[in-house]
């Protein structure tokens, strides 16, 4: 395995953060912890239900890690929506992360998908059955146009995960395949549309801005994720079907060339995101900017992405990019580094165990143990 291109990664990250004028001021520390715990607590109770436990069949440690990661993403990024909306979105996106980590073949359970859908029957695929049950709780926050985007994008995501089951990075010469798959499993339209709850935005009045935001967010969100995930995925055998690796296969280019391609597209998208909305409705621009800054903070602070390892590696280096990266990292940590023990309690497994005893109050006590570690 070749060495990770640390200097290139530092330069790319710094340019990205400079382009979006990174300065996360979305919350006070108290507000952040309050929102984290509210969203987590509701979502934890949801996944501790017997039906969810029986149908998902997810390892408790993995489910706990997935939930903590997603709650962080939603609370940090969807800073303008209500706590109730944050909680419902956290549940929805946790379902998507659970599916993304699954290795089950969906084919048998999807044979009668449309017939069951048309007849109003419960889906044979357990993931679809549970997601469909929760969807009304999500869609109640949004108007019909945004809701349609959430539904359609979730269906695309399922198809993208299905494709990934084959660990297929594309055929050489199939230049459209990498972006096709990334758009399919990126949830860009779902994310872009879920920024505009009807209690804050009239989707008819802001239709043009919302439509443009969905279009722009589709690429920006997934490309930033791919860049910020590049370090953790670099030598992980489970993450070899990534956009960068698929560029290498399909475009028949080197890894450095593929990373440069992603870098240029991400930076261009970031410039567009800022420029397009600069003179639009201030509330729209504020929502987008808060999302971008919170999304970056989440990546820098969530242990899943291991960017603290980069920070420790380069904090004593004297290069300009190393200094800038460390300054940005410390800036993010000052606002976003919150230990899970301060908000991620009770654990889902504990809730599930005590539910039958009717002693849910006991499970509400903070836990200062394994939840400190997020996969």
Swiss-Prot record:
SUPFAM superfamilies: Terpenoid synthases (SSF48576). The keyword Lyase applies. GO terms for molecular function: trichodiene synthase activity. It is an enzyme of class 4 (lyase). Keywords: Lyase. It comes from the Eukaryota. The keyword Transit peptide does not apply. GO terms for biological process: sesquiterpenoid biosynthetic process. Pathway: Sesquiterpene biosynthesis; trichothecene biosynthesis. InterPro entries: Isoprenoid_synthase_dom_sf, TRI5_ascomyc, Trichodiene_synth. Pfam families: TRI5. Its EC number is 4.2.3.6. It catalyses: (2E,6E)-farnesyl diphosphate = trichodiene + diphosphate. Belongs to the trichodiene synthase family. TS is a member of the terpene cyclase group of enzymes. It catalyzes the isomerization and cyclization of farnesyl pyro-phosphate to form trichodiene, the first cyclic intermediate in the biosynthetic pathway for trichothecenes. It serves to branch trichothecene biosynthesis from the isoprenoid pathway. Trichothecenes are sesquiterpenoid toxins that act by inhibiting protein biosynthesis. This is Trichodiene synthase. It comes from Fusarium boothii. The gene is TRI5.
